[in-house]
Amino acid sequence: ENMSYLALPDGTRLDVFGHGGGRTLAQAAGVPFIGEIPLDPQVRVGGDAGTPIVVSHPQSAAGLALRAVAQDIAAKVSVANFMNQNNVIPITEIS
Protein backbone atom coordinates (compact mmCIF):
# COMPACT_ATOMS: atom_id res chain seq x y z
CA GLU A 1 0.00 0.00 0.00
CA ASN A 2 1.96 2.97 -1.28
CA MET A 3 1.55 6.30 0.56
CA SER A 4 -0.12 4.35 3.35
CA TYR A 5 0.60 6.89 6.08
CA LEU A 6 2.84 9.80 7.02
CA ALA A 7 5.58 8.92 9.52
CA LEU A 8 5.91 11.86 11.91
CA PRO A 9 9.23 12.88 13.50
CA ASP A 10 8.09 11.65 16.94
CA GLY A 11 7.57 8.14 15.54
CA THR A 12 3.80 8.26 15.35
CA ARG A 13 1.88 7.80 12.15
CA LEU A 14 -0.76 9.96 10.53
CA ASP A 15 -3.19 8.09 8.29
CA VAL A 16 -3.65 10.88 5.75
CA PHE A 17 -5.77 8.80 3.36
CA GLY A 18 -7.48 6.55 5.92
CA HIS A 19 -6.25 3.12 6.97
CA GLY A 20 -6.69 -0.42 5.74
CA GLY A 21 -7.78 0.16 2.15
CA GLY A 22 -4.89 -1.77 0.64
CA ARG A 23 -5.37 -4.71 2.98
CA THR A 24 -9.12 -4.78 2.25
CA LEU A 25 -8.51 -4.64 -1.51
CA ALA A 26 -5.91 -7.42 -1.35
CA GLN A 27 -8.26 -9.59 0.68
CA ALA A 28 -11.13 -8.97 -1.77
CA ALA A 29 -8.84 -9.84 -4.70
CA GLY A 30 -7.58 -12.98 -2.95
CA VAL A 31 -3.95 -11.89 -3.04
CA PRO A 32 -1.49 -11.45 -0.17
CA PHE A 33 -1.06 -8.04 1.40
CA ILE A 34 2.67 -7.37 1.34
CA GLY A 35 3.03 -4.15 3.30
CA GLU A 36 2.49 -0.47 3.90
CA ILE A 37 4.91 2.09 2.46
CA PRO A 38 4.72 5.48 4.18
CA LEU A 39 4.48 8.75 2.32
CA ASP A 40 8.00 10.22 2.26
CA PRO A 41 9.27 12.90 -0.17
CA GLN A 42 12.73 11.30 0.02
CA VAL A 43 11.40 8.33 -1.96
CA ARG A 44 10.84 10.63 -4.95
CA VAL A 45 14.03 12.62 -4.37
CA GLY A 46 16.11 9.46 -4.24
CA GLY A 47 14.34 7.98 -7.23
CA ASP A 48 14.96 11.11 -9.30
CA ALA A 49 18.62 11.11 -8.27
CA GLY A 50 19.07 7.40 -8.90
CA THR A 51 19.69 6.61 -5.23
CA PRO A 52 16.89 4.53 -3.70
CA ILE A 53 15.75 5.48 -0.21
CA VAL A 54 16.91 2.08 1.04
CA VAL A 55 20.43 3.33 0.25
CA SER A 56 20.15 7.05 1.07
CA HIS A 57 17.99 6.73 4.22
CA PRO A 58 17.98 3.01 5.12
CA GLN A 59 16.68 3.54 8.67
CA SER A 60 13.79 5.82 7.64
CA ALA A 61 10.25 4.48 7.92
CA ALA A 62 9.99 4.24 4.12
CA GLY A 63 13.43 2.64 3.77
CA LEU A 64 12.64 0.01 6.38
CA ALA A 65 9.17 -0.64 4.92
CA LEU A 66 10.49 -1.04 1.37
CA ARG A 67 13.23 -3.39 2.56
CA ALA A 68 10.66 -5.48 4.47
CA VAL A 69 8.39 -5.68 1.40
CA ALA A 70 11.34 -6.67 -0.82
CA GLN A 71 12.43 -9.35 1.65
CA ASP A 72 8.88 -10.72 1.87
CA ILE A 73 8.55 -10.88 -1.93
CA ALA A 74 11.99 -12.51 -2.27
CA ALA A 75 11.03 -15.14 0.31
CA LYS A 76 7.73 -15.87 -1.46
CA VAL A 77 9.49 -16.18 -4.85
CA SER A 78 12.12 -18.46 -3.33
CA VAL A 79 9.47 -20.76 -1.85
CA ALA A 80 7.48 -20.77 -5.11
CA ASN A 81 10.61 -21.67 -7.08
CA PHE A 82 11.49 -24.44 -4.63
CA MET A 83 7.96 -25.87 -4.77
CA ASN A 84 8.01 -25.84 -8.60
CA GLN A 85 11.54 -27.15 -9.14
CA ASN A 86 10.20 -30.28 -10.84
CA ASN A 87 8.29 -28.14 -13.34
CA VAL A 88 11.38 -27.12 -15.29
CA ILE A 89 10.79 -26.08 -18.87
CA PRO A 90 13.47 -27.73 -21.01
CA ILE A 91 15.52 -25.51 -23.28
CA THR A 92 15.74 -26.87 -26.79
CA GLU A 93 18.34 -25.69 -29.24
CA ILE A 94 17.04 -25.22 -32.76
CA SER A 95 19.69 -25.52 -35.44
Model-assigned labels for residue ranges:
Residues 1-95:
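C-terminal lobe/tail of nucleotide-utilizing enzymes
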